Design a protein with these regions (language model features):
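Feature of Fe-S/electron-transfer and energy-metabolism proteins
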Residues: 1-618
Length: 618
């Protein structure tokens, strides 16, 4: 593909997809017919830069319409946004869900990550590839976790076409999308050939074995409330927290969140109240709120269940966070592999806006706030907050060096507070119960309830809500752990393994830290003795190799060297593997000490724990 403006022209379909998002072009500079006005003015400077953030939605519009992004389509989008084609090409090729090469309109994504691999995903792929040949009009792609681990193995079918191309910045609802989970060869082939006739997904409540249980603080409405009905949400306590927030005022809300001891639920466990206070106190304006719903850690699916089962709770929580921090505009960065969550959140935001719960005068309080959805496109690295900012702004999703920190210079260079879905939803019980009552749940250092994503060798996989302090063994017993347990992976691919004799580890940030492991985002993946550990470790190494953004040498090179070493020792043990294990340790230390962001810093964790705790390759 030529990296400059060329002679390639967009098709009528491509032009229509872009124009549906951006509106019709105003001049020949943007691709319209030439007029006398073109001799007198051209959009540039600030006006051009202010539209750069529409690049990602524009790429989605093209990819959704045709299934790939052609040179002519990319050129037209670049002219409309005044973005150099070379930069737009770099953005388009950064994301796994986009293609800049021709491919069939239907793509079958089969998860081959940890939970699905243990459930037979490799055999599923082979069967699908054998039955969906070149003449089928379907591309079969093996890929990372789809966030459907409780129903492994999982597959996602996406069909491009006019109905699939959205005309919103969020990318629109990918209507011709079908989820098959648990997937069988027959089911995925049927879904791939006729996704519009695929069976409906099961309700989100099936991913919550404890549901319906109104006593749950975070999951109590899942399975009880109609996720599409705002009135039903309000009848079950919805918007009580926002009304209390208005009564407290911004400073009072921050004080309540601080006193509750709420820590971020994304893995870093940073105090939420401190982050909000730091953002609110910044003199530079405007302030922004970003909700990170791009959960891509293998084994994680809690945010999907919350958005599918209780979407208005997230809208309310984002509104409270914006009120407290002085933000007037919020972005919900939602994972591209979550079509139903996207549909539910778009509907919830539209209904809230129509009922005066978003917009210029929320609940008549003189507070203005609105939410815009940005759909991700398959990049694990965009879970890192500064990479996510770059993605929203229309650049490659590469992490930024810190400082400056996001509370000072975040999205668009302005003070920004970024929280994930679970963290924000925890704010609701903080305000409805009060800080002291909330802090009484859990432990002194880890307060409140926590969501755990349990999958693998258990009879009842799903999302579990438990107070901090419950042990790993108690959680696995609740989930029905099977006989022959060999290891448990805590925190996903970036986490660590523990042995079956370590199930008394308390599930708190401080408890897992003292045990030499991590709680991470709440992934708890059980593996029995039928799962080959070397193959599991190799898949983790492949995952980090694929997902490294390549910006820094320690991660770019280290993840490849780690995978190469694991390939070499896959069939060796003991002394034969000693040299490569020594190399792995050296590479792992280099990645941990010198990588820019958490991806490289944690890429060695699971492999290290398997060697040291499980005796892998002995």
């Amino acid at each position: 593909m030529d990296l400059r403006f060329g002679d390639s022209r967009p098709t009528d379909e491509e032009r229509a997809a872009v124009d549906a998002l951006l509106g019709p072009p105003e001049s020949s500079w943007e691709g319209a017919d030439r007029s006398d006005a073109d001799l007198r003015w051209a959009r540039g400077g600030r006006a051009a830069r202010d539209r750069r953030d529409l690049l990602l939605p524009g790429l989605h519009a093209l990819n959704d319409r045709l299934g790939w992004i052609s040179e002519g389509g990319l050129d037209y989008l670049c002219r409309r946004l005044t973005v150099p084609p070379s930069e737009a090409y770099g953005v388009a090729t950064f994301y796994a869900l986009f293609s800049v090469r021709p491919r069939p309109a239907t793509v079958l994504h089969v998860c081959t990550d940890l939970a699905c691999a243990a459930a037979g995903a490799p055999r599923l792929c082979e069967a699908a590839e054998a039955r969906l040949g070149p003449e089928s009009g379907v591309t079969v792609e093996r890929g990372p976790c789809l966030g459907l681990c409780e129903r492994a193995p999982a597959a996602l079918v996406v069909r491009a076409g006019e109905d699939a191309a959205g005309a919103t910045a969020g990318g629109g609802v990918t209507r011709a999308a079908a989820v098959s989970a648990p997937a069988t060869p027959d089911a995925v082939v049927r879904a791939a050939l006729t996704p519009e006739n695929a069976p409906e997904e099961p309700p989100a409540a099936l991913a919550v074995p404890q549901a319906p249980d109104p006593g749950l603080l975070l999951l109590g409405r899942v399975g009880t409330v109609d996720p599409a009905d705002l009135d039903d949400y309000r009848a079950h306590g919805g918007y009580t927290a926002l009304r209390r927030a208005f009564a407290l005022g911004p400073a009072g809300v921050i004080r309540e969140v601080t006193d509750s001891g709420l820590l971020g639920r994304g893995g870093a466990a940073f105090p939420t109240g401190r982050k909000w206070q730091a953002t609110a106190s910044q003199p530079d304006h405007p302030h922004y709120l970003v909700c990170n719903a791009d959960e891509s850690e293998p084994g994680t699916f809690k945010d999907r269940v919350l958005m599918e089962g209780d979407p208005y709770a997230l809208v309310e929580a984002m509104t409270i966070a914006a009120y407290a921090t002085g933000a007037r505009h919020g972005y919900l960065y939602l994972r591209g592999e979550y079509p139903r969550a996207l549909e539910r959140m778009e509907h919830a935001i539209a209904q809230a806006r129509a009922r005066g719960l978003l917009g210029d005068d929320v609940l008549g309080q003189g507070f203005s706030f609105d939410i815009e959805i940005r759909r991700g496109a398959g990049a694990y690295i965009c879970g890192e907050e500064t990479a996510l900012f770059n993605s929203i702004e229309g650049f490659r999703g590469e992490p930024r060096s810190k400082p400056p920190f996001p509370v000072e210079k975040g999205l668009f260079g302005k003070p920004t507070v970024a929280n994930n879905v679970e963290t924000l939803v925890n704010v609701l019980p903080v305000l409805t119960l009060g800080a002291q009552a909330y802090a009484a749940i859990g432990t002194g250092a880890s307060t409140g309830p926590k969501l755990f994503c349990v999958s693998g060798s258990v009879d009842r996989p799903g999302i579990y809500e438990l107070p901090f302090g419950a042990t790993l063994g108690e959680l696995l017993t609740l989930a029905g752990v099977r006989d022959g347990l060999r290891a448990v992976l805590l925190g996903g691919a970036a986490g660590g393994f523990v042995r079956p004799d370590e199930l008394d580890i308390p599930l708190t940030f401080e408890g897992t830290r003292e045990a030499g492991t991590t709680l991470g985002s709440g992934v708890v993946m059980a593996f029995d003795d039928t799962v080959p550990l070397p193959r599991l470790l190799l898949r983790i190494a492949e995952f980090f190799r694929d997902e490294s953004c390549g910006q820094c040498v320690p991660c770019r090179v280290g993840t490849v060297r780690q995978e190469e070493a694991l390939h070499r020792i896959a069939e060796r043990t003991g002394a034969d593997a000693a040299a490569d294990i020594t190399l792995l340790r050296e590479v792992g230390r280099a990645m941990r000490d010198a990588s820019i962001c958490g991806l490289g810093q944690t890429a060695w964790n699971a492999v290290e724990s398997a060697i040291d705790r499980l005796g892998a390759y002995e």
